[in-house]
Amino acid sequence: MENIIEINNLTFKYDNKNALFEDLNVSIEKGKITTLLGKNGCGKSTLIKILAKNLNYNSGSVKIEGKELNSYSLKELASILAIVYQKNETPREITVYDMVSFARLPYQNIFFYKPTASDVEKIEFALEKTNLQAYKDKRVDELSGGQLQRVYIAMALAQSTDIIILDEPTTFLDIKYQKSIMQLVRDLNKSLGITIIMVLHDINQALAYSDNIIALLDGKVIKNDQASNFFDETLLNRLYDADIKIEDGKVISW
């Protein structure tokens, strides 16, 4: 087992408030789908913002691919880690192809950007792997919610094939598109070996599509284990402060 992300003794607090994370230790396995699970306010979104260098932590160590996070420039980090946030602004009158090409924009001279041959190859690769080739000339504001989510995943894929973080990727989708997106995530992981980190609110999705789950409660990891070891009513009830029932391998009430 090789860990692609190692977090040791991490402390983080907002302004002068009490620490959200204190001596947090997390390891994320390379090439696996790992889901962060827990109720609102437990630290899931904060953790991915730290990994993206959108928030600075107070102390401790965060290593990605063996290198300290603070040693990465934003451009270097973007080449190995991409994030699809829960809420994204959708521009009007722009094609799917142009939208995905934005992922290849450098951090300088963006107004003079012209795709290189390598950029074009990665854009076409991302469109192919997300089944968007037939839509590449279509305007993004004409797409369904599920198709649009594929565009955002394609953008992440065009940016990085090392680590992709998905923040609630199915929240605003109906059941049909939820299953389609989760199957796409699994296919990308299995076919390309991409390390995928997800934040999910749906426990059944986490149990069905994750290799590993990290359970966070009040800024602490209470369990980091294979998903198959999370079919535990006592654990889930503690995690969500709810009356959760599991039947035939699924959460049926909570």
Residue positions per predicted region:
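Conserved ABC ATPase signature
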Residues: R139-L143
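Conserved ABC transporter NBD signature motif
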Residues: G60-E68, L77
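The feature captures the beta-strand-to-loop junction immediately N-terminal to the Walker
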Residues: L37-K39
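ABC ATPase nucleotide-binding domains
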Residues: L239-W254
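Helix-to-loop junction immediately C-terminal to a conserved catalytic motif
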Residues: A52
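Catalytic Walker B motif of ABC-type/P-loop ATPase nucleotide-binding domains
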Residues: I164-E168
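A short, flexible loop at the N-terminus of ABC-type nucleotide-binding domains that lies
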Residues: M1-I7, T11-D23, S71-S73, P91
